[in-house]
Amino acid sequence: MIELQNVGFAYNNKHTVFSNLNLYIDRGDIVSIVGNSGCGKTTLLNLIAGVLLPSKGEIKKSDKNIAYLMQDVTLLPYRTAWENTFLACELRGIPVDNIQKQAAKEILDLFNIETEALNKFPKELSGGMKQRIGLLQTLLTDASLFLLDEPFNAIDINALNSIKLYIWEYLIKSNKTMIFITHNIDQALLLSDRILIMRSPTKLLEIKPAKEYCSLSPDERI
């Protein structure tokens, strides 16, 4: 469970981003945040993650086991893609055993990551491949709450369909929560069951279920 109550935030106590934000996300929800650049999407994710602290109000989280995938995927340049796959687990002190490796291989197949790509170093990987490795890193942590900032924007539609199948099955079966940012409304409709449309830091429109987006007027859509 995540609850934001009358949350306000300003950078350097001058540039106000949020002044009175209220939001409730239940455990097991898959939520997308959609909006134009500069409307506060990443700031909202940083507040939920605890990277930033609100200047007023309160943020409640029932579970502190959070995995946060930022826009710039962390891949060590001297490690292969396969070795980088387990970086987040290592940083959390999670043993990289045969069970973890088998889980990684199963996800790799669904993500359409070829064995040849796993032997490459980050500088040899495409943007989409780096994103898939970063997403795999994050999912292997087995966190309760996944926060993802633009995780799919360089991933082709065929791979995205496979990722959707895995994410839905994995998250729903284990009752985990995912919140992700996207500029692409099609990705939001494909992957989430709730959509938060941010017109501005003060205007948040929630669509639940996501399929109701299609019934909005053109002025209400992104």
Language-model segments: what does each one mean?
Residues 121-125, 129:
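Conserved ABC ATPase signature
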Residues 49:
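Helix-to-loop junction immediately C-terminal to a conserved catalytic motif
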Residues 34-36:
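The feature captures the beta-strand-to-loop junction immediately N-terminal to the Walker
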Residues 175-181:
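Conserved H-loop
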Residues 146-150:
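Catalytic Walker B motif of ABC-type/P-loop ATPase nucleotide-binding domains
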Residues 99-116:
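Conserved ABC ATPase "signature" region
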Residues 79-86:
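Short coil-to-helix segment of the ABC ATPase nucleotide-binding domain corresponding to the Q-loop/switch region
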Residues 141:
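Conserved signature/switch motifs of ABC ATPase nucleotide-binding domains
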